[in-house]
Amino acid sequence: MTIHGFTCIEGHTEGMPVRMVIDGAPTLQGATMNARREDFVAHHDWVRRTLMLEPRGHAHMSGTIFYPPVSDNADFSLLFIETSGCLPMCGHATIGSIAFAIEERLVVPKRPGTVTVDVPAGQIVARYQTDGERVTSVRFTNVPSFLLKRDVEIAIPALGTLAVDIAYGGNFYPIVEVQPNFPGCEHFTPDELLAWGRDVQRAVGDALEVVHPDNPAIRGVRHCMWTGKPIADDAHGRAVVIAGDSLVDRSPCGTGSSARVAQRFARGWLKEGEAYCHESLIGSRFIGRVESTVRLESGVDAVLSSIEGRAWVTGRAQYRVDPSQPYALGFSLQEFVN
C-alpha cells in the first residue's frame, strides 16, 4: 500500500460528529448500495478503521462516504461508516451529509427542496429548508421501520432481568423502557449505560437471532437504546443510544428515532402523523412522525417514518495515510483490553 490521501467535510448533526469523505474513497463493485456495502466490508474496511478510529478519529466518531447515485432517480449515494462498522443506515449522518452536500455544492438536486439518496438499506427521500446558502433543517423519510419483537426477557449482571422491545429503523435496536430494574437513563452515567449497552447487545444475541425479514444480509444487534424522562417540558421522550463497544450517540439517533416511532406506533402509544419530539443525552432533538403504514414483502407490518433535524459544517480536513507510520490504519483501545 502506498501513501493515500482523503478529503473530508467535518461537521455535526445535533451534536453528533459526521465526517463525510468526498475524495480518496475506493471504487466499489455492485449494482446496489447494499451490494457495494458488502464489497466495502470485504475488501476496503481499512478505510473505515483509518478515518473513524484513533489517531484520526475517536471512540464516538461517525461518518459517511459520498458516492455518485446508483439509481437513475437518485441525486447521490451514501455509505455509512463508524467505529462499530459499516452500517446499512444512519439517520444523523444522513441529515448531516445532505446538509453538507447542498451547502458545499457537491450536488444540485433534481428537484429543489428535495433530494433522493441511495443507501445500503434502500432509498430515502428528504426535504430540506434553507436560509440563503445555509440548510436550516433536513427531514427524511426513512426505510420501512417495524417492531420485530416485544417484551424479550434478558438478564445483565448490573441490572438483572429486563424486558426489551426490538425494533428496526435502519438498524436493530433493543429498546429498554423504564421498568422496575431500570428507572430511566437520567439516573445513570454515560459510562454505565455504555458498559451495560454492550451487555444488552450480547444478551439479545444469545436470546434470539435478529434478522431483517426481507433482507437476511441485515442481521444482528450492534446498538442499544436506554430511555428516560426528557429534559425539556415540550419533549416527549429521551434516549441514550449505544453503538458497538464504544460509541455513545450525542444526537437522539436517526435510525433509533425511527425504531422508537415504529415501536410506539405498534404499541398504540403514537398516532399516524403525530409529532414525537425525541431528546438525546445532551438535550438535542429530532422530530419523528409516522407518515404512513406499509407491509413488507414478508408480510410484516411496518411504517414509513420521517425524522427531522439540523446539522452544521465545522470545516474541511485532509488526511494522510502512510503505511510506514505506527498505527497507520487506526486502533481502538478496546483492542488492547483482555
From Swiss-Prot:
Active site (record annotation): 90 (proton acceptor), 253 (proton donor)
The reaction(s) this protein catalyses: trans-4-hydroxy-L-proline = cis-4-hydroxy-D-proline
EC nos: 5.1.1.8
Top-level EC class as recorded in UniProt: isomerase
Pfam families to which the protein is assigned, alphabetical: Pro_racemase
Entry GO MF terms: 4-hydroxyproline epimerase activity
Alphabetic keyword roster: Isomerase
Binding site for substrate: 91-92, 223, 249, 254-255
Family: Belongs to the proline racemase family.
Annotated function: Catalyzes the epimerization of trans-4-hydroxy-L-proline (t4LHyp) to cis-4-hydroxy-D-proline (c4DHyp). Is likely involved in a degradation pathway that converts t4LHyp to alpha-ketoglutarate. Displays no proline racemase activity.
UniProt name for this protein: 4-hydroxyproline 2-epimerase 2
Organism: Burkholderia multivorans (strain ATCC 17616 / 249)
Protein encoded by which gene: prdF
